[in-house]
Amino acid sequence: MPKIIKLKDGAILLYHKNTQSKATAFRVGMLRGGYLDKNTGLSHLFEHMLFKGTTNWSNEELTALIRDNFSNLNASTSGDYMIIRSYESKKKIKQAFKISSDMLLNSTFDKEELEKEKQVVRQEIIRANDDIQRIASHNLNIMAYNYPELKSKTLGDEKKMMAITQKQMLKHREDNLVRENFIASVCSNLPACTIKKYINEYFVNHLKSGKKNTFDSCNFTINGKSGMVVETMDRQKVVMKVAIPCNGYLDMKKSFLLSRVLSYTSGVKGPLFDHFREKKQLVYSIALRRNTNKHDGLLFFDIETSTDKVNECFYAIKDFMDEVKQGIAQKDVARLLEKYEENDDRFVGHPVDFCSGLMFDYLDYGRIVKDKEFKRLKKYVTKENLDATILEVFNPDKIFISVAGPVNKKDIMPLSKIERLIIG
């Protein structure tokens, strides 16, 4: 049974019993990420420097320790968090916790190593600034949610990142790696009491109490008005993100039904494929995706097309929505139920998946979603419920459009015309 274990001063341990193997998957770190970095990339650079030596081990010694004691070790930074993650055998888990703890708590951020690592991150920023999909997604989010913090990219601005000092790194840890922001997510065959003991021993007991980060991107609400942003770039293709509002994660029934609707519309030879590929050959690729949080979210058409077919794609979206609003056939309902059973039978659950799932459940819902909640939801997969979900989602009152590639805004139909076409 997954559980949330509250530790001292608000530190959080998320635990799931691993019944599949004797391995332990864990994520440890802080609920403080790039959204609050003011586009400096400080959190991300901090993550990189965790591997560059501590007060106890030099860079070379730490590298050797990691090589000898970890089968899998990495770290990651998002807008909301910075964590170390690993997947280890039962025999090595204490040593894995010990080394991870030293990396978090005692990294020196050596000045010479810091300057070297900045060059590594600089290359990441250059690649990201050349990634048309990433640019279109970023522009969509900051327009649709209209929160200033979203403008802060996790990698940061190159010039600002290059100016970060050792002193800033140390202060970042001092201010943010506190008990109130600490989180650990663990899937292990070891009992919860043992994992709790290790987390306290190697992490929480060494942290001070401090100021809790109250910023939560999962609480964002959608902008009240439609919008469109176009970024002209010299590329071979155009990327379009055309989004409409959809419900967030808190309503489990609605969220589950929406996932079934997406399975129906986006399948091979389904309505989405039919309108964009079979009938008119409009796109290089097409998908219908979700981007949701606790309260609000987006359902967006993820399109790659050519410059001359951008406007035609809006008409295809209109035709697609008109078709699906006619309702789902009973044979497709039966197919969805059959597919659900097949997926359920195939799923075993890797400890790494459980570990990450626990953390995302906690961030998205503020709690852990139990397996039986999803199993109970299967009974809601009926034609009546699916039709109601389709009508709710595909009758939007606003639309958000992000376009990037070899196209100018003046060549795209006006937003007001797109609104009349798709919203009515």
Residue ranges and their predicted role:
Residues 16-32, 210-275, 423-424:
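His/Glu-based metal-binding/catalytic segments typifying zinc-dependent metallopeptidases
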Residues 6, 59-214, 249, 278-424:
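Charge-rich, well-structured scaffold segments of protease-associated domains
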Residues 12, 25-29, 183, 241, ...:
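Residues embedded in well-ordered beta-strands
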Residues 41-54:
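Active-site SXXK
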Residues 30-40:
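Short pre-active-site segment immediately N-terminal to the catalytic Zn-binding motif
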Residues 13, 23, 36-38, 411:
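Short N-terminal binding/cap micro-motifs at the start of the first secondary-structure element
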Residues 10, 25, 81, 227, ...:
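A residue-level signal for beta-strand positions that form part of recognition/binding surfaces
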Residues 1-23:
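N- or domain-start disorder-to-order transition segments that initiate the globular core
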